Amino acid sequence: MGQKVNPLGFRLGITTDHRSRWFADSTKPGQRYRDYVREDVQIRKLMSTGLERAGISKVEIERTRDRVRVDLHTARPGIVIGRRGAEADRLRSELEKLTGKQVQLNILEVKNPELDAQLVAQGIAEQLASRVAFRRAMRKGMQSAQRAGAKGVRVQCSGRLGGAEMSRSEFYREGRVPLHTLRANIDYGFFEARTTFGRIGVKVWIYKGDMTEREFAREQASAAPRARGRADRPRGRRDEGAAPQQAAAPAATTGTEA
């Protein structure tokens, strides 16, 4: 079961938290549960449109009666904010037009993008779109995650790999990735690479160690005050120009799925 289910949804309330936090019991049009779900999908689609280079990791949405708070986690906050905050103002105005409510937009920087599964998947997909060999791209993403402190990494690519006539799936794994262990802190990301041969799906699992319920509650309690009142400002600084050093590829576990 742990091999098939989404690792994030499988661990809700144990090591992960909901990315949409609101309650709806109204029967009025525009305030029903289905209306909020559709609106959340539209918000996330709007956040990904035109910000492909920003390295967006995840979008968290929280609603009150007359306000919507959107937390945008990104590896490059400067691209999202824009010159003198022009891009952030544009995003906020589009969100207010979409929701019809006051929107609080918080732009938060991902401190360690090499350990973020979604960003690693995006990086591999960008390399595949640039015609880099898929095995080389997979190994490079795994090496960067291992150097950043990951205890285990698994990367899987599915599609017409290398331009082959028949599609297949291949994966590489280093370290431990215990998908059945609920207390295991496993980050999961998926992204599609658009190549000349068609789309190639990239899945990434990163194991960061075990987490107890007490540690999870402490992490949630410390994250709430940091996000409050920091609209349109990145959290922390990071040298975007520094490139990771190249290292020799270690021995890895490989596999092929028909």
UniProtKB/Swiss-Prot annotation:
Ranges annotated as biased composition (Basic and acidic residues): 229-241
InterPro entries associated with the record: KH_dom, KH_dom-like_a/b, KH_dom_type_2, KH_sf_prok-type, Ribosomal_S3_C_sf, Ribosomal_uS3_bac-typ, Ribosomal_uS3_C, Ribosomal_uS3_CS
GO BP terms, alphabetized: translation
GO molecular function: mRNA binding; rRNA binding; structural constituent of ribosome
Keywords: Ribonucleoprotein, Ribosomal protein, RNA-binding, rRNA-binding
TM annotation in the entry: none
Origin: domain of life: Bacteria
Gene3D superfamilies to which the protein is assigned, alphabetical: 3.30.300.20, Ribosomal protein S3, C-terminal domain
Biased composition (Low complexity): 242-258
SMART domains: KH
Renumbered residue ranges of the record's region Disordered: 217-258
GO cellular component: cytosolic small ribosomal subunit
Domain KH type-2, residue spans: 43-111
Task performed by this protein: Binds the lower part of the 30S subunit head. Binds mRNA in the 70S ribosome, positioning it for translation.
Sequence similarity: Belongs to the universal ribosomal protein uS3 family.
Quaternary structure, from the entry: Part of the 30S ribosomal subunit. Forms a tight complex with proteins S10 and S14.
The protein, known as: Small ribosomal subunit protein uS3
Organism: Beutenbergia cavernae (strain ATCC BAA-8 / DSM 12333 / CCUG 43141 / JCM 11478 / NBRC 16432 / NCIMB 13614 / HKI 0122)
Protein encoded by which gene: rpsC
